Amino acid sequence: MHTILLVVFMIILGAIIGGVTNMIAIKMLFHPFKPYYIFRFRIPFTPGLIPKRREEIARKIGQVIEEHLITEELIRQKLNQPQSRNMIQQLIHKQISKLKNDDVTIKKIAGFLGIDVNELVDYKLTTKFLNKLNFWYESNKYRKLSEILPQSFLDQCKGQIEYITDFLCERARNYLSSEKGERDIYELLDTFFNEKGRIIGLLQMFMTKESIADRIQHELIRLTQHPQSQKIITKVLNDEYETFKDKNLDEIIKEQQFKNYSQLVLNELKTYLNLKDKTERPIKQVVPQFIQFLEDDTSKRMTDFIIKGTSKHLTNIMKKINLRQLVEEQINTFDLKYIENLIIDIANKELKLIMTLGFILGGIIGFFQGVIAIFV
């Protein structure tokens, strides 16, 4: 009986020692969280293994994740899988449908991004438009008009001179034939007679003032139809045109005048475009064809563009993200108690098995120690 009790006692003692030893060993992985000192000497095994090796563990985990788990090749493969492609395309379709069904405006979309679209468009249009025009003027103000304008345009203008001659003659005939033209001729003739006095008054002995005015009107109309008159007008216009096109730009229009005209054109352009109204109207009303185009063709192209663009620039993206450093920094920010609970939650069964194995091995060792003690 004494022998059996000795063996049982040794088994229980060995099991307790083995189990408790494993429990202490597991605890020592995490505890203590900080080193303890006696005088100036640090107590061995403080802090625990994981707190002590925390930075190294974080660095190794980051390295493993970057080099073996989340690699560039793996991400490329995932991006090009049909499931990923379909998911991206469905997301694009969803956003397009939202644009179509909701009263989403350009102003509202810009507002989400913190942009005042009306102010931005007005600023961009004003600065770009005026800067372009001012730059063009500064670059060309000392050049002749014939050097600035295309030759085809100059030839076309020259070809219009005969048409202008015919136009001027026709307008002159219409004016001279009108009641106003007849009245103006009579008034000018009356003024002329009054200024020239008696000598001119002698003409009235042979012709009345009305007949003289009628004669002048008839002759002026005839002159507008005479080929020689038309040739003279054409020659004058040609000479003026040649003189005009050989002038420098700044002789034709001064810099301040050009700026004033540019501002007037810009104001008219803004009024015509009415961009403020367009930014406050639903996109489906402003550009319905664009929404239809997005539905019919763009979603697939955008999906291809996103996948190809991401794959192409993935190396640079991964470098900028620096996954290894990101994981390392994140792990180093974790509270040690949180890390302990996390590991215990993950390996709870295995840790319990280790403690149980400690009890079993301790009991077996205790059994053999008891047997040996009987024979010693």
From Swiss-Prot:
Mind listing the UniProt keywords for this protein, alphabetically? Cell membrane, Membrane, Transmembrane, Transmembrane helix
**Positions of transmembrane segments:** 4-24, 356-376
Locations listed in the record? Cell membrane
| This protein's GO CC annotations | plasma membrane
Q: What is its main location?
A: membrane
Membrane protein topology class: Multi-pass membrane protein
Source organism, top-level taxon: Bacteria
Give the similarity note. Belongs to the UPF0754 family.
What is the name of this protein? UPF0754 membrane protein SERP1382
Q: Which organism is it from?
A: Staphylococcus epidermidis (strain ATCC 35984 / DSM 28319 / BCRC 17069 / CCUG 31568 / BM 3577 / RP62A)
Ranked from the top, the taxonomy reads:
Bacteria, Bacillati, Bacillota, Bacilli, Bacillales
